[in-house]
Amino acid sequence: MARSIKKGPFVDDHLMKKVEAQDGSEKKQVIKTWSRRSTIFPNFIGHTFAVYDGRKHVPVYVTEDMVGHKLGEFAPTRTFKGHAADDKKTRR
């Protein structure tokens, strides 16, 4: 279910402050965050976020196509190892 339009998009305040602080400086560093729920704003473009996936921080470089999505969409939490191999082929 989508968020109500009257509420507007959500972004954590501490994350927005970190982005605004880096916009003023020349050197851009990786911004480490646990806020997977934050919406990507247009002023995030060009920044790299280290988004926590429950195990480690995954680097996510924000491009123009990502605006409006959540940070957590680009850091998957589950790793799929594949289904078990079929033993019928090895028995022949």
UniProtKB/Swiss-Prot annotation:
One of the record's GO molecular function terms: structural constituent of ribosome
Keyword field: Ribonucleoprotein, Ribosomal protein, RNA-binding, rRNA-binding
One family name in Pfam for this protein: Ribosomal_S19
Highest taxon, organism lineage: Bacteria
InterPro entries assigned to the protein according to its UniProt record, in alphabetical order: Ribosomal_uS19 (IPR002222), Ribosomal_uS19_bac-type (IPR005732), Ribosomal_uS19_CS (IPR020934), Ribosomal_uS19_SF (IPR023575)
GO CC annotations, alphabetized: cytoplasm; small ribosomal subunit
This protein's record includes keyword Transferase: no
GO BP terms: ribosomal small subunit assembly; translation
Coiled-coil intervals, chain numbering: none
NCBIfam families in alphabetical order: rpsS_bact
Record function comment: Protein S19 forms a complex with S13 that binds strongly to the 16S ribosomal RNA.
Family of the protein in this entry: Belongs to the universal ribosomal protein uS19 family.
Name the record gives this protein: Small ribosomal subunit protein uS19
Species in which this protein is naturally found: Staphylococcus epidermidis (strain ATCC 35984 / DSM 28319 / BCRC 17069 / CCUG 31568 / BM 3577 / RP62A)
